Each structure stands twice: as C-alpha cells, then as structure tokens.
A protein has these predicted regions:
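C-terminal regulatory/interaction module of P-loop NTP-utilizing enzymes
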Residues: 1-296
Length: 296
C-alpha cells in the first residue's frame, strides 16, 4: 500500500485528515513502529485505530487501560478451573512432572489482548487505549512488546510475534509517559478541529443534514470549547450527536430555544449548563444575538 492508497481508504471511511496525519500513519506502518497519539479526550484518537483497521482490512484488538491493569488482564492468564479439573482426572494415572508440564501448555492458556495480537496468524491493529491511565509498572512491562515484538511468560518462555501488529497507543496526558516509551514510538498530537475541519466532519458523517444547521452547530461548539468556564469540552462525537438530535427533531436552525432543548447532547454536567445559561442571558441583556443563531 502506498500513501495515496492509504488516503483513498481513509476517504472511503469518511475520515477527515490532513497530510501530516496521513504521512505519519503511512511511515509508522511502513517502518513497523508503534504510534503514540496524544490529545484531549474526544478529539478522535481512538477513531484513528478503527480507521486504520478498516483501511488495512485487519481485525482491531483493543486493550482499554485503567489504574491497576496488570499482565493477567493485558497479556494472559491460566485457566485455573480447567487445570484443577485436569489434576483431579489425571491424579495417580500420570507422572507428576509430566502432569505439571502439561498444565502450563497452550491448552490452558487464556489469551488477553496483547498476546492475542502477536499470536494472530494475520496481522491486526492493536489499540492500547488511554495508556496514561495505567501505572508506570505496566508501561515498563509494555516496552518488551513494543521494542522486540515479543513477550515473556515464565512458565512458557519467550513468545515471538507470528505477525507484526500495527500498534496505536493513545493518551489524554493524565500523567507524563516515560521517555523510554516515547522513544519506541512515532508521535502524533491531535487538537480539536477548527471550524472548517469540524464542518467537513459533519458533512462527511451526516451528509443529509442541512449545511446551514451544521455551520451553526459547528460555530456553537467552537465557542463552547473556547469558553474557559466550560469544564468538559465537547468532543467530536458529541458534536455529531447534537446535530443528529436536532435533525431527529426536525430542527433546521439553532435558535436559543433549540439550543436549550438539546444541549444535553453536547454538555454533560450541570455546571456547564449553568455557564451556557449565563452566557445566553448575558448576550440577551446586552441586546446582541438574542434572536440569532450563534449562542454558545
């Protein structure tokens, strides 16, 4: 696959990208380098892994990170129930050393996302989502996989990748990631889309919706994101949900009433609702925009 073919595949997936993003994706893919994508929550980092899986016609294997994540959830664990059953059935009928060896064979190994991705016969896209939520010990454990494309299991030994996955790591920057991890990855920082890009996303994902309504919503979302008082900045997915909600109600214009009725699709806590209300009241009291369409 060359870079133009990759761009064509992303176009087919209705994914809006720029040349920098397409180039980084292509080169990381060609070099077999993991790709670390950072940015605020909701800018579309996870979507990139999904689009790449579709573009490459590969399965997407996802590891959702969280505090306390360890090898048994990320890499493998043993099927203890099956092992106990085997011990009960074979007790006395098999040599104890042979039985012990058999208990730690493939038959009793439960694959978790990391092991599944490197033991797959066909290459996959491995998404390690929100790596910043996992602790530093887990991050250190990942280094062997990312640099050597292999993992070590004490009872089995080293398992090398049958196929090399395209690895995408995402981070919301909740904590700093180690330099060792960063060195092993290509890097991409995703910002919230500007007005023009957000409009392009809305057109691509919701082509049946009136362009004027999309423009009004995109502008309102830009204003919400730039408002320092808003605690949870609207994500791209929430922008899409908001337009879909307005469209489902047959609303063709983002009036103050329409905004109030549907704001729950774009704002997700009471404090932000109060900020919106204060902003609208302030605009009305100073006589500007009150009958207009660009509240936010």
């Amino acid at each position: 696959m060359n870079i133009e073919e990759l761009k064509q595949k992303m176009d087919e997936a209705h994914y809006i990208y720029d040349d920098t993003l397409a180039t980084v994706l292509f080169v990381a893919l060609q070099l077999g380098r993991p790709l670390l994508i950072e940015g605020a929550a909701g800018v579309g980092k996870t979507e990139i892994a999904k689009v790449m899986a579709a573009a490459l016609d590969r399965d997407l294997v996802r590891l959702q990170c969280y505090e306390g994540l360890d090898e048994s959830k990320a890499l493998y664990e043993w099927n203890y129930q099956k092992q106990l059953l085997s011990i009960q059935v074979n007790m006395g009928s098999r040599d104890s050393d042979e039985l012990t060896r058999s208990l730690f064979s493939d038959e009793y190994l439960l694959e978790r996302p990391l092991l599944k991705s490197i033991r797959s016969e066909k290459p996959v896209v491995l998404l390690i989502d929100e790596i910043d939520k996992a602790d530093e010990e887990f991050e250190a454990f990942l280094l062997e996989l990312l640099s050597e494309m292999q993992v070590s299991i004490p009872e089995v030994g080293t398992i090398r990748a049958k196929s090399v996955p395209f690895v995408v790591l995402t981070s919301n920057r909740a904590r700093p990631l180690s330099e060792a991890l960063r060195r092993r990855c290509a890097y991409l920082y995703i910002q919230y889309p500007d007005l023009e890009k957000e409009m392009a996303i809305l057109r691509a994902k919701l082509p049946h919706v009136d362009d004027r309504l999309c423009a009004q919503v995109a502008l309102a979302v830009q204003k919400l994101r730039s408002n320092e008082a808003i605690l949870k900045k609207p994500s791209i997915a929430e922008t899409l949900d908001w337009v879909a909600a307005l469209d489902a109600l047959g609303i063709r214009e983002l009036t103050p009433d329409a905004l109030r009725q549907t704001a729950g699709f774009v704002l997700k806590n009471n404090e932000d609702f109060e900020v919106l209300e204060e902003t609208q009241n302030r605009e009305c009291s100073c006589g500007s925009h009150c009958g207009g369409h660009h509240h936010g």
